[in-house]
């Protein structure tokens, strides 16, 4: 919006978050200015990394600083749209997530800190599918299974 710059947006968000008890978090399905968001006074950042992985990974410095402030990243890696979900399996989604992680580790993000400060989730909040809620329910089951696989591998 014309006339609504970063400083005004940051001030408005800071004012809003000052009225919210911690932990303070935000979820975004889109592709915002990640540097701007990662530098807000947030505790939790939830994002659609399934769609935005490459762009998000280019903000390694801001991600590292966010994690050093004990921020939590919720990696939305399981699509909830019917057609997209049908194209994937758990192993392809794990590989997709680990590819992003490897890029970040290669750019200086501490592996142990990142793993300790990470959660996984569905990528989006899609509730309109040809099969109604079935794909979303299957996505949550997949998240649980992926979580167990990743815990075994990394913890």
Give short role names for the model-derived ranges.
Residues 43-153:
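Catalytic-face loop-and-helix region of soluble metabolic enzyme cores
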Residues 1-59:
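Active-site loop segments of alpha/beta catalytic cores
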